[in-house]
Amino acid sequence: MSRLAFLTSAAALLLGCNVSPARLTGGVELPERGDCPRGLAVVSTDFLSSEIALLAPNGDVKSPAFMSSASTVANGLAAPFSGDLGVATARSRPGELVVLDRLGTNVLTFVDTRTGAVRAQLPIGTGFEANPQDYLELSEQEAFVPRLGDNRSPGREPFDAGSDLLIIDPSKPAITGSIPMPRRPGFWPNPAAVVQVGGDVLVTLQHARADYSGMDESELVAVTIENPRQRYQLPLTGLENCGRAELSPSRAVLAVACSAFVDRKGAVAKLETSGLLLLDATTDPPRELRRFLATELVGEPLQSSIEFVTEHVVLFKTQTALGSELDNQLFALDLETGKSTLLASAARASNGLGFGIAFGGMSCRAGCGDPCLVADLSRAKLLRFEVEADELVPRADVEVDGAGLPPAAVTPFW
C-alpha cells in the first residue's frame, strides 16, 4: 500500500494518545546464530514519535526502549529520529542496525545493537524529499537504497534525480552513485523495495502519479551487483502497488503481494489488480509459476507485504479502509492447495469503526526454530505463533512496554 495511506490511517486513529518518552534501556548482548538472526527490532510509533525495541528471537523483550525520537547526543545522534522510521530488512554487518528515517528527515543511522552507540548518520535527501524505503547491504563497501520520492528540480546537487536506486558505501558512510529507474509517461518509477537474487538486486517499482492519484502496473527491475546497471525489466502484468519480492526458505521461489492502488483513506477501487504472484527464482529472468488474485483468495484486497512461514506456507494481510465496516485480517495461505486459513482479525477502533491499517510488519524464521511475530497496531501488541508442521499455533502475545506506542514493524537483525 502507499506509505501515505498507512500514515493517514494509523495516525488518525492514534490521535490523542498521550505517550511520554521512555527512559532508554540501551543495547543488549545476544548470541550470534550463524545464518539465523540474533534478534528482532520492533518499531513502535504513532507517526509523531517513535521508539525501537530489541527482542530475542523467541519474542522476549530484552530492551524495550533501545532508541527513540527522544534520543539525543547520549546515543551520538546528530539528527534526532522522527515518527516515521523503518529498519533495514536484510542482513548488515554483525550487531549493527540500519535505521531509515523517512519523510521530512531522509537520514540513515548506523547503530550498534550491543551498546546503543551510533556509528554514523548519513543524510540521503540530496536537496529534496527522498523518502528512503529500504536498505540492502551487499558488502562492507556497497549498499543500495531505493528512494521513493522524485525531485522536480534536479541538477542542484550530486545524485539528486530522485525516484532512483542510491548506491552507498556503508564503511564511510557516503553516497557513491545513483542508478536511474525506467520511467513511464505520467508516472514516477517509485522504487519501493529491494531483494538480492543471485548476482542481481530486484527492485520493485510501483509507478505512481506525481500526486498519488493513481498507479500503473508494477514491475521488477534487475540491477547487477557488480558494476551496477539495469539488466532486465519484468512487468507484473495486471497488478498494481506491489511490495518486496520475498524469497522462500530454499531461495527457489519469489512471492510478491500487490494491494492495488490505495487512496488516502486506504480504500481500493480496482480489486482485480490486487493479488499474490509466485515466480521461479531459479530461471533468468524469474518465470511466473502461479497467481492468486484477491478476488479468488478472500474477496478483499491484500496488503503489499508477504512473509514465508515455510516453503509452502505464507502469511498475508487484507487491506481495509479507515472507518469501514471491515477490519484487517491475517491469513496463512497454503501455496500447494490454495487454501487460506484465518489466523486473526484486527480489533475495532474506540469509535466502533474499522481501524484501517492495523496489521503491520511480520517476521518468521521457522527454519531457525523461531516463532512468527506480527505487529498489531489495533491491540498495541505483537501476535505470536509457533510453527508446527506447516501449521501456525497461537501463543501468548508480546507487549513491548516502552513508551506506550503501538508496534508497526518487526525486523530481524544479525
Q: Could you say what each language-model-derived stretch is?
A:
Residues 58, 112-116, 169-173, 224-228, ...:
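Short loop/turn segments that connect beta-strands within beta-propeller blades
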Residues 159-170, 216-226, 271-281, 328-334:
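Beta-propeller blade signature
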